[in-house]
C-alpha cells in the first residue's frame, strides 16, 4: 500500500501525477482547523505534507500522528514550528537553491526602480503630467559605481553581489554571521560590522530570514545611521524591519527611498502610509514569482517529499537531526 500524504497546494498535472505514482494523495485547500476536521481520517493517516504559506504548528501536528515529513514550496519556513516537528522526528524539507537567481533579479529590479524612480515617473506619464521636456523634479540617481551593502551573504546575497560587481561596477560591503571568503575573492566584497555598512552604503539590501535574532533588526537607530541619500531594500522577511520606524525615516528624509518586497503584515494594508509615498516601490512578495521558478520550486518540493519518505535527506533538509 502506498503511503498517504496531504497536498495543500494546487500543482501542475505532471507534478501531481509524479506524487500519485508514489503516494495516495488527499488534496485540501488549506490547513485551517475546519479543513483538518473535515478530512480528519486523511490527516490522521498521512505520512507526508506538502504545500506553501500555511501555518504548520503543534495543534496541526496533534492531528497528524503518522506524519514523517513535511515539504514546503519555499526557502523560508518561519510559518513552521520547526522545534515541534523535530521533537516528533518529522523532517522539514525546503527549496533553497532553485529560486536564488530569480530573487536576486528581483532585488536588482527594486534597486533600479527606486534609484531611477521608474514607478513614480511611469505613473506620472500615465496621469498626463508629461507635457514638456522633463527637469530635475523627474530625475533619479545613478546605480552604477555606488556602494552596495548586503546584509545576509547567503546564496541570494552572492547572486546579488555578482550582478552588482560585474554588471554595475559597484563596490560591495557585506555583513553576515561569518565571513564569506568566496564573496571576498570573487567580488572583492568587504566584510564589516552592521554600523559601518549602514554608514557607508548607498544601497542597503536586506536578505535575511526571520529569526528571534533578526526580528526588528532594523529600527529607528539603524535608519538614523544611514546616509540621507541611501536607498533601503528589503527582500528577506518583513518583520526583520520595524515598519513604523521605516515609515518615519522616509517621512523625515533620513533615507532617500525604499524598495520593498516583504512587509510586517502581508498583504500590506491599503491604509499603509507606504502606499502614499512616491519614493517607495512596494511589490507583493514577488521575489521568486516567475512561471519558471515557481514551477521549479514545486518540482523540487515534490522530489524532496519523495526523497524524505524514502529516508533520503542529504539535501534541502532544515532539521536533519529529526531523522536521527
UniProtKB/Swiss-Prot annotation:
Tell me its EC number(s), please: 1.1.1.79, 1.1.1.81
The reaction(s) this protein catalyses: glycolate + NADP(+) = glyoxylate + NADPH + H(+); (R)-glycerate + NAD(+) = 3-hydroxypyruvate + NADH + H(+); (R)-glycerate + NADP(+) = 3-hydroxypyruvate + NADPH + H(+)
**A Pfam family matched in the record:** 2-Hacid_dh_C
Q: Which InterPro entries match?
A: D-isomer_2-hydroxyacid_DH, D-isomer_2_OHA_DH_cat_dom, D-isomer_DH_CS, D-isomer_DH_NAD-bd, Glyo/OHPyrv_Rdtase_B, NAD(P)-bd_dom_sf
GO annotations of cellular component type: cytosol; plasma membrane
**Alphabetic keyword roster:** Cytoplasm, NAD, NADP, Oxidoreductase
Report the principal subcellular site: cytoplasm
Give the GO molecular function terms: glyoxylate reductase (NADPH) activity; hydroxypyruvate reductase (NADH) activity; hydroxypyruvate reductase (NADPH) activity; NAD binding
The residues annotated as the active site are: 237, 266, 285 (proton donor)
Report the subcellular localization: Cytoplasm
Question: Superkingdom of this entry's organism?
Answer: Bacteria
Would the keyword NADP be found if you checked this record's keyword annotation?
A: yes
Self-association and partners: Homodimer.
Q: Which family does it belong to?
A: Belongs to the D-isomer specific 2-hydroxyacid dehydrogenase family. GhrB subfamily.
Cross-referenced HAMAP family, in alphabetical order?
2_Hacid_dh_C_GhrB (MF_01667)
What name does the UniProt record give this protein? Glyoxylate/hydroxypyruvate reductase B
What species was this sequence derived from?
Answer: Salmonella newport (strain SL254)
Source organism phylogeny:
Bacteria, Pseudomonadati, Pseudomonadota, Gammaproteobacteria, Enterobacterales
Corresponding gene? ghrB
